[in-house]
Amino acid sequence: MTDTAARALLRRQLEAHLCSLGYSCVHARRLAPPVPEIARVSPVRGRVAYGETVLRRDLQRRRCHERLLNLSQRRTRRRSTILLFIAVAERDRRDLEALLERLNIQNGIRGGHVHLVTVAPAAAAARTKL
C-alpha cells in the first residue's frame, strides 16, 4: 500500500473514531501552525479534539516529532488540554509509544490527553475492498 493510500485509510478510521465519540463538528476557528490534520469539536460539551496520522516513515522524521510535541502541548484559551488522537497502524504502535515516551509526551504520569487509535491490517484490507 502506498503512503498516500495508507494515510487516507488511517484518516478515515480516525474520523470514524472521533465521530463515534461525539466529535462531529468541524472546528472552524483559525488555528496556529502547525495545523492539525483533523480538528473537531463536541457539539454537546464544546470540547476540542485534534487528530493526526502517523506512518512508519514518519516515526524517524524530526518534523513529525516536532509536530506531535507541539500539538500535544496546546491548550484552549481557558488553559484546559486539547485531546490529541493519533492514528497508527497496528504494527507501528509499539514504536510510536516508545517515541511518545522518549519525547516525554506520554508516560506513566503525563499524556492522559493523548490517545492512540490503532488500525488493524485486517480492517484496512476490508475497507479498501468496499
Summary of predicted features, one role per range:
Residues 29-31, 52-58, 87-91:
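Structural motif
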Residues 61-88, 92-105:
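Short, charged, amphipathic alpha-helix that recurs within catalytic cores of restriction-modification
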Residues 90-130:
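Domain-level recognition of nuclease-like catalytic cores that cleave nucleotide substrates
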Residues 33-36, 82:
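A short helix-loop-beta-strand connector motif used in the catalytic cores of GNAT acetyltransferases and
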Residues 1-34:
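Acidic-basic catalytic patches of nuclease active cores, encompassing PD-(D/E)XK
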Residues 19, 42-48, 76-80:
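Flexible, charged surface loops at secondary-structure boundaries
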Residues 36-72:
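Conserved catalytic cores of phosphodiester-cleaving nucleases, focusing on short active-site segments
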Residues 47-51, 80-88, 114:
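Hydrophobic beta-strand segments of well-ordered beta-sheets in folded domains
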